[in-house]
């Protein structure tokens, strides 16, 4: 199969993975309206083409939290990454490390902190949820610090799990889920051999290390359902600061007032995110939410963004809308499921090339030169007639 874009990796991953795993990462909440709008809204951001600008000295390098990044991209935290490729977190981290960008380990990773951190030279980031079990949170923070993690990504948009209908149909949950997953694995021998048999243990490494016993998929679903904490408030940041003195990024911001609160409570960064459309359907896409948030806090706090980013052009669009750096989630997981470390490395190379093309044709030599001036129009304003939805009676 020819791989020329992230969409090719998605198609390949769908063939490789058992349906319960593919749809778990590919799907969203409820009717998946926000999931679709994340991609569609970003694709409608029109860039301003410029010519004769002497683009011979192009640089994608940027700095974030005193770290130098080869390009303004980091790999987002993704749960169960090790179910998509053999020891998937280790492979993805290696690809990010080789590219010179951060890798973020999820709380609910298959590979524990202590397995991933020693395999890379660059300090990785660690993602944490607010959970009822504060003992686990403290333990995770202490272990992350001991392993040399540089930045904490604190996910706040999940006080309760979203309603994901696809999971019930695919076998991740629902009636006879375990039996359905077993037969799906049998029908996908490549995955069954590489990950199902040789990728063990399949427990949640960070949680198992704390509980002192293996924590498998069924335990994962139950443990998360029982431990998400709806009482989460901004005061939890003060508690976390007692155990974490490094950069802290608040992930899951969609409203300018919440962004201002993040500044007031001393966060170092925010991630403009709707959890990839996996939590509350019907909320704004990240691309639509980003400009107002940037207007409110740009310069006061680092602004990261995720949800809907599929290529280097999307990265440039997000930066033009106000982000300093973006996080990749689904895109890199499709590549990981298809070809492991090599797949993620190739995807990052593709994104780098796509960014260079976009920057060359918009006249931006450096990341700092990508701004609102790079846009023909911002989201939310009237579309040109050629792009506006057809009204009744119009014909294509």
From Swiss-Prot:
Residue span(s) of domain FMN hydroxy acid dehydrogenase? 1-380
Instruction: Name the EC number(s).
Output: 1.1.-.-
Active site: residue positions: 275
* One Gene Ontology molecular-function label: FMN binding
Alphabetically sorted, this entry's keywords are: Cell inner membrane, Cell membrane, Flavoprotein, FMN, Membrane, Oxidoreductase
Family according to the record = Belongs to the FMN-dependent alpha-hydroxy acid dehydrogenase family.
Q: What is the protein name stated in its UniProt record?
A: L-lactate dehydrogenase
């Amino acid at each position: 199969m020819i791989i020329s874009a992230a969409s090719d990796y998605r198609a390949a991953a769908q063939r490789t993975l058992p349906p319960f795993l593919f749809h778990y990462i590919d799907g969203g909440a409820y009717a998946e309206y926000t999931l679709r709008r994340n991609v569609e809204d970003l694709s409608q951001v029109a860039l301003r083409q410029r010519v004769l600008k002497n683009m011979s000295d192009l640089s994608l390098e940027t700095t974030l939290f005193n770290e130098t990044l080869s390009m303004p991209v980091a790999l987002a935290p993704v749960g169960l990454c090790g179910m998509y490729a053999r020891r998937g977190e280790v492979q993805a981290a290696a690809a990010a490390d080789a590219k010179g960008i951060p890798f973020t380990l999820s709380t609910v990773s298959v590979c524990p902190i202590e397995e991933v951190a020693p395999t890379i030279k660059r300090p990785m980031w660690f993602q944490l949820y607010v959970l009822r079990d504060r003992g686990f949170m403290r333990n995770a923070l202490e272990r992350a610090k001991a392993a040399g993690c540089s930045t904490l990504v604190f996910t706040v948009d999940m006080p309760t799990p979203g309603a994901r209908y696809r999971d019930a149909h695919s076998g991740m949950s629902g009636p006879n889920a375990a039996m359905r997953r077993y037969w799906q694995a049998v029908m996908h021998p490549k995955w069954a051999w590489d990950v199902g048999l040789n990728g063990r243990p399949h427990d949640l490494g960070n949680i198992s290390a704390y509980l002192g016993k293996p924590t498998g998929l069924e335990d994962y679903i139950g443990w998360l359902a029982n431990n998400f904490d709806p009482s989460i408030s901004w005061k939890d940041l003060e508690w976390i600061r007692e155990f974490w003195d490094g950069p802290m990024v608040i992930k899951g911001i969609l409203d300018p007032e919440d962004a201002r609160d993040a500044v007031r409570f001393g966060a170092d960064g925010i991630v403009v995110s709707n959890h990839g459309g996996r939590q509350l359907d019907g909320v704004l896409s990240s691309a639509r939410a980003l400009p107002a948030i940037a207007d409110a806090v740009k310069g006061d706090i680092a602004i990261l963004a995720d949800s809907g980013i599929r290529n280097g052009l999307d990265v440039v669009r997000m930066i033009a809308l106000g982000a300093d750096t973006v996080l990749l989630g689904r895109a890199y997981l499709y590549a990981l499921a298809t070809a492991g470390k090599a797949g993620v490395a190739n995807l990052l190379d593709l994104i780098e090339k796509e960014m260079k093309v976009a920057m060359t044709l918009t006249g931006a030599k450096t990341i700092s030169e990508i701004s609102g001036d790079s846009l023909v129009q911002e989201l939310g304003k009237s579309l040109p007639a050629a792009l506006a939805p057809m009204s009744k009676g119009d014909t294509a």
